[in-house]
Design a protein with these regions (language model features):
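Cofactor-cradling patches in redox/metallo enzymes
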Residues: 10-18, 42-47
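Gly-rich Lys/Arg/Thr-decorated short loops/hinges at beta-loop-alpha junctions or inter-strand turns
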Residues: 1-9, 139
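Hydrophobic alpha-helical positions that pack around
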Residues: 34-154, 160-164
Length: 241
């Protein structure tokens, strides 16, 4: 969870650290992994300390075995640190090949919500029918982190948070960096819904011609080049696709 404004995974770490660790242990057994590494950004130090304490307590109480190695690391807070390829490189210095998967470099990546769901599925036969998400933004009267049943309409979720205020004119699903604009509240929460955000309309920005300085490529963690937007703007949609 590296998107600004989204804090639902952070709340899960504070409220269900034991379930997360036990779920990670089950995932390790299922995949045959030789170690577990938990990465937490350094703006969540209380979650880091809590996870570390619970891990030590579980080992001490023999709730999980001492072996194999399990480590908890603090990572620099930056976007997109939580993206799986970036996370793998930050923790292990392994590069996932273009078009490849983490498994290609001997890694399986799960977020804390998935780890918790694995534990609940095995321990309580509970199917995945709910999702932790953040409802926030200046257009939301009472921002909250919620656990919502999949299929619940955005309208009901927003109403639970005190309905939209008068400034809300933009509604999106996800974090502010990788949003999906929504044109209606009559859409359901899905498995991938990490947040519902509402803002006032943004002031239009003046668009300037690209001088091809390359700074955007240098700043991009994946080295992506801005070709699709340029081709689309030139009416070359098939080439951009």
């Amino acid at each position: 969870e590296c998107e600004p404004m989204l804090t639902s995974d952070y709340r899960l770490m504070l409220e269900a650290p034991e379930d997360i660790i036990k779920g990670a242990e089950l995932a390790r057994i299922a995949t045959g992994a030789k170690r577990i590494i938990i990465g937490i950004e350094d703006n969540k130090k209380n979650a880091f300390e809590l996870i570390q304490k619970k891990l030590n307590d579980l080992i001490k109480n023999k709730a999980i075995p001492e072996e194999p190695l399990r480590e908890v690391f603090l990572l620099k807070t930056k976007y997109p640190q939580g993206a799986e390829k970036n996370l793998i490189f930050a923790l292990l210095r392994r590069k996932v090949p273009s078009g490849g998967l983490p498994f290609d470099v001997g890694v399986v990546v799960q977020n804390v919500g998935t780890a918790k769901a694995i534990w609940e599925a095995v321990s309580f036969s509970k199917p995945l029918y709910e999702k932790a998400l953040t409802v926030t933004g200046s257009g939301i009267n009472n921002p909250k982190n919620l656990i919502v049943r999949i299929g619940t309409s955005f309208q009901k979720v927003v109403d639970f948070c005190g309905v939209l205020n008068d400034t809300a004119s933009i509604l999106v699903m996800g974090g502010p960096m990788m949003v999906i604009a929504q044109w209606s509240l009559d859409v359901p929460v899905i498995k991938g819904t990490s947040g519902i955000l509402a803002w006032p309309a943004a002031r239009p920005q003046t668009e300037h011609s690209c001088i091809r300085c390359g700074r955007c490529v240098g700043a991009c963690p994946t080295g992506a080049r801005q070709l699709a937007g340029r081709r689309t703007g030139a009416g070359e949609s098939p080439a951009a696709a």
